[in-house]
Amino acid sequence: MKVIFLQDVKGKGKKGEMKNVADGYAHNFLIKKGLAVEANATNISALKGQKEKEKKEAIAELERAKDLKETLEQLTVELSAKSGEGGRLFGSVTSKQIAEALQKTHKIKVDKRKLELQDGIRTLGYTNVPVKLHPEVQAVLKVHVKEEA
């Protein structure tokens, strides 16, 4: 019997996949527990519609990421921190501080985990911070750390 999986079933199929399984397994387990539905014309057309919708959403998300990349690459985030001799900071500027400053000054919300900053910024001046907006889109944000008065 052909079924369309509504959820991932370990060893059998992934969500949205159409597969042939034993009749008893389909009726007594998959359909009964709501893990799959019978693959009839109505359900197949609904699956196609859902896949098209997901594809459109993925394209829209990619476009939003590209637009955000354009915006971020034109901005400079300015932060101030206490520093000692030679421009070394006491502590460091973290991705959390950068994300908060970006939200406060430019009204752009970016998750701190998307800022790919290894150890934090430990010196005064300009630093380019990579921002992973989407698996296919990466922007570079310019961060200026100046001395706190």
Swiss-Prot record:
Does the keyword Phosphoprotein feature in the UniProt annotation? Answer: no
The Swiss-Prot or TrEMBL record annotates one GO molecular function as: rRNA binding
- A single GO BP annotation from the record? translation
User: What is a single cellular component term in the Gene Ontology annotation?
Assistant: ribosome
UniProt entry keywords in alphabetical sequence? Ribonucleoprotein, Ribosomal protein, RNA-binding, rRNA-binding
Q: Which InterPro entries match?
A: Ribosomal_bL9, Ribosomal_bL9/RNase_H1_N, Ribosomal_bL9_bac/chp, Ribosomal_bL9_C, Ribosomal_bL9_C_sf, Ribosomal_bL9_N, Ribosomal_bL9_N_sf
Specify one Pfam family.
Answer: Ribosomal_L9_C
Role played: Binds to the 23S rRNA.
NCBIfam families per the UniProt record, alphabetical: L9 (TIGR00158)
HAMAP family associated with the record: Ribosomal_bL9
Q: Which family does it belong to?
A: Belongs to the bacterial ribosomal protein bL9 family.
Q: What is this protein called?
A: Large ribosomal subunit protein bL9
This protein's species is Bacillus velezensis (strain DSM 23117 / BGSC 10A6 / LMG 26770 / FZB42) (Bacillus amyloliquefaciens subsp. plantarum)
